[in-house]
């Protein structure tokens, strides 16, 4: 998205700030390190509002601590995963510019993971699953953007939101411009389905020929609708 100099500078900044989260902005094609003013910089970042006036950021990059901890299941995991949190997503949606994450354990450091509305233009099939970036709802948004020229609302979300008492798809479909389907299905209709979850946690788009486009795990792609009928709980249609 930006040149190697931006990536290199952001990665070096992340290493120098670890275990605190680093943050910076890209302005004029150059990475500018910014002071993280969050109350708890080990677990989040905050940028002074004046930065937006001084730099007119084209993008924001921050770091995640990838050092190994023991999860609730007793297995090792990174302290913060290499994908955006709900707070990260909310900040990106509000800012309206691309955001990036670099993950480091203080020694190794990842490449920049970019996300934002530019992902809408990526190919619809063959996407690698990544929570909040390339997941089922992200694919629905991308299909509507590419095939209908419609920009659906995005929703900040944590991985596993469905197991935390939330019902994002059902609660949010009206805000995204959808209404319940009454009648035969049409191309572009969207389904909600339970995928081993107490509430609908998966969505996809109906295509012609009895197919659906969806992104459950692995790579996004098409498959026959019939394979998912027993899991589907809702059908909705976009109402321009």
PLM feature segments, named:
Residues 119-120:
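Extracytoplasmic and endomembrane cell-envelope/extracellular-matrix remodeling and assembly machinery
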Residues 100-102, 215, 238:
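Generic beta-sheet signal
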Residues 159-226:
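...with weaker cross-activation on analogous glycine-rich loops/strands in unrelated enzymes
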Residues 124-130:
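Second-shell loop/turn segments in exported
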Residues 150-161:
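Short acidic alpha-helical/loop segments enriched in Asp/Glu that coordinate divalent cations
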């Amino acid at each position: 998205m930006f040149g190697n100099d931006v990536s290199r500078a952001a990665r070096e900044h992340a290493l120098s700030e670890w275990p605190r989260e680093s943050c910076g902005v890209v302005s004029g094609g150059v990475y500018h390190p910014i002071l993280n003013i969050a109350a708890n910089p080990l677990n989040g970042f905050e940028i002074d509002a004046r930065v937006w006036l001084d730099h007119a950021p084209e993008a924001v990059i921050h770091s995640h601590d990838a050092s190994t901890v023991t999860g609730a299941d007793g297995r090792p995991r990174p302290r913060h995963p290499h994908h955006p949190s709900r707070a990260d997503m909310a900040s990106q949606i509000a800012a309206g510019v691309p955001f990036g994450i670099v993950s480091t354990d203080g020694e190794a450091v990842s490449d920049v993971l970019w996300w934002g509305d530019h992902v809408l233009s990526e190919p619809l099939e063959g996407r690698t699953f990544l929570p909040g970036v390339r997941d089922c709802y992200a694919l629905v948004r991308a299909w509507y953007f590419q095939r209908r020229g419609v920009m659906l609302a995005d929703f900040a979300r944590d991985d596993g939101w469905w197991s935390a008492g939330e019902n994002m798809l059902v609660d949010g479909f009206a805000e995204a411009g959808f209404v319940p389907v009454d009648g035969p299905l049409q191309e572009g209709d969207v389904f909600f389905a339970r995928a081993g979850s107490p509430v609908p946690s998966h969505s996809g788009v109906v295509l012609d020929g009895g197919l659906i486009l969806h992104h459950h795990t692995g790579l996004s792609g098409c498959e026959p609708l019939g394979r998912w009928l027993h899991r589907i709980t809702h059908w909705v249609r976009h109402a321009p």
